Amino acid sequence: MHCAKCLAAWLLIPVFAAWSQATPPAEKNWKAVCSAAKQAPVRQPDLAGPLRPSQLPDCHVQQWYYGYGIRKPDYAAALQCAWYGRAHADPSVGDMFAGAGTLTMLYANGYGVPRNYTLAIRFACEEPWAADAEQEFRLGHLETMRAGRDTKPFDLCDDVTSGLNMGACQAVSTQQHTGSRQAKVDAEVSNLPSSAKSLFLALRGAEKAFEEARAGNEIDMSGTARGMFYEQEMDTLAAQFLINLQRFHKQDVPVATAADLQTLDGKLNAAYQQLMKVPASKWEDYGTIKPEGIRETERAWLKLVDAWARFGHEAYPQVSETSLRAQLIRLRLHQMQSLAKMLAT
């Protein structure tokens, strides 16, 4: 079994790392449960605020529910947004959090409304993008909570089994990290000399271009879990960018001589050439990962290294350009070697 396909069995287990702690009991008769749950009419409550009616068409329910970008959750706003989303559902958009999805969480947890498991189950049954296995686990989870055997907060991501919804959950996890990470980046930049600050925007742009190239070209995007893998890689790269800022600031990188740099550069070039020489037939087993994508990513990385060198000269004069470039090469070499190892299996 090739590496690009070895996660297939794992993807069927509802153990999304950021949320789920144990596999819940499954409701094998979930279709009958849902059929009964949908019989009772549901009336939207009168909601006075805090969002104005004009804000509802563009509201982002995940932002209000999870609180990323606004410091803390606002369940009253999430409730408004979710009810609006349910009333204006777009069946062509695969968003499990839209409308009924977030209503499931709000009513299951009693966030912004009295806890109501009957409604939570009803809304869970309205989710059109959930796999059958996902519904078995989700309905079983809610029934376990209603019976008082599970008191932990409920989240849709506890029970995901499909690649599509794993991607949605990873996107939430990434967004939750982004706010705190950005605050740390801002803190690193705030004390830099103005000459460095003027170069930071260009560095950030080069970093973004590399992150998108790396995640889009060197991670297999062919499976249903592609969204999750893409978001995971973007999160990893963003975390590494912050680590780089912190380590260069603290001078916490190995001192490299010109000879060291030449050796590392030679290793990187050898790894790159090895990948470029892999027969075309070999790449067929690895989905969207192709030599041309690696080449595009490498070009973006070279621009990023140059941007780091210009920025580092002003921001970290105590760190030699040789040491800075060597550290960046080490990180890229690890990525190249991981690709080569994948192809060798």
Residue ranges and their predicted role:
Residues 1-8:
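Bacterial N-terminal signal peptides that target proteins for export
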Residues 21-345:
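N-terminal alpha-helical modules
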Residues 10-21:
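Hydrophobic h-region of N-terminal signal peptides that target proteins for export
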